[in-house]
Amino acid sequence: MVACTSNDDIVKDNELPVITDAGITANPVDCQVYSRGETIPFRYRFTDNEELGNYNIEIHNNFDHHTHGTQKDNCKLDPKKDSKDYKKPWVYNQDFTIPRGDKAYDAKQDIQIPADIDTGDYHFVIRVTDQAGNQQLRSMPIKIK
C-alpha cells in the first residue's frame, strides 16, 4: 500500500504581513523632519496571519524625487539635486530578526543619523516578510536638515 499526498492539499499562506501603527505611537511618519546627528526612534507594529519572519529598514536619498508608490502624504520637497552635486548622501540598510512563532511584533530601533551627511529629502523604507516569504513595504518621505 502506498500513500500519496498532493500539493493541492497544502494550504499556502498568500496573505501579506501588515505594517501598522494601531495601538502604538508610530515613528517616523510621512513628512517628519530630523536634524543631522539626531536619532530616529523607529516604532512600528507588524502582524501576520501565520508567522512573521524578519524586517528591514532602508533609508536612502530622494534627491531625484522618485517614488515607491506607498506614500500617503505629499510633502514639500527641496529642489531636485543632480547626482554630481551629492557630497555624502546617506544610505542605511539593516535587517532585523523577529522571534520565531510571533504573529505580532512591536519593532523598536534607534537609528543614529550621521552628522556629516547631505541634507535634503530621504525615503524611510520598511519591509516586513513573513515565514512564507510574503513581503509588505511601506515608504515614508522624511527630511534631514
Regions found by a protein language model. Give the residues of each.
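Short, conserved catalytic or interaction motifs in soluble domains
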Residues: 6-7
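C-terminal motif of bacterial Sec signal peptides marking the signal peptidase cleavage site
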Residues: 2-3
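First exposed extracellular module after export/assembly in secreted or surface-exposed proteins
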Residues: 14-145
